[in-house]
């Protein structure tokens, strides 16, 4: 009995078109899978880089001359690093934090924190001037939609319209608190007074 040698892969693919299509689909599927894994890894790397930068900033802020210089420095920070900085500072105070899956496309929600068992949404904004009252109004609507309170944390000035909008929300069951200036610095310094001033 004579044993024939197996056909080469090329000859097999030429003879059997179904097998050829199967190999092509397998190859395309592998490329898509590698692309998705690379993209996921890039987002994980980016998140890790923002977190490391935020950790460095938390160490650097106390070395700056005063609160005005600290706020000025924060205004120049990458917006995603600023978000991570706030969440990291809250975690270091023992608060449970929920991060978004991604930094952009968050519909105005930059994270969540649980304070004394109550869920609060976080909106982080780096402003060099007065905050836009429309941003405060949009965030207030988001609080109603999510049925919880919110912390609008920013580096700018809080104008009269924004203050009024936040004050009027306190009569709602979903209050909105604006954290900036001294309270922002207290939060980043690990001083729990920033929370008590909300209550």
Name the predicted role of every residue range.
Residues 1-107, 112-199:
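Mixed-charge (Asp/Glu-Lys/Arg
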């Amino acid at each position: 009995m004579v044993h024939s040698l197996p056909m080469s892969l090329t000859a097999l693919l030429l003879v059997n078109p179904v097998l050829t299509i199967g190999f092509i689909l397998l190859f395309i599927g592998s490329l898509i899978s590698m692309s998705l894994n690379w993209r996921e890894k890039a987002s994980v790397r980016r998140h890790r880089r923002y977190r490391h930068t935020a950790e460095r900033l938390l160490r650097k802020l106390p070395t700056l001359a005063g609160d005005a210089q600290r706020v000025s420095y924060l205004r120049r920070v990458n917006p995603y690093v600023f978000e991570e900085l706030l969440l990291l500072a809250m975690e270091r105070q023992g608060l449970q934090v929920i991060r978004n899956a991604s930094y952009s496309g968050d519909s105005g929600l930059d994270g969540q924190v649980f304070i004394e068992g109550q869920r609060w949404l976080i909106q982080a904004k780096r402003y060099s001037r007065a905050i836009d009252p429309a941003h405060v109004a949009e965030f207030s609507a988001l609080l109603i939609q999510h049925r919880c309170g919110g912390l609008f944390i920013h580096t700018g000035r809080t104008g009269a319209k924004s203050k009024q909008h936040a004050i009027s929300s306190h009569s709602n069951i979903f209050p909105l608190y604006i954290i900036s200036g001294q309270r922002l610095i207290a939060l980043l310094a690990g001083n729990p007074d920033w929370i008590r001033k909300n209550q």
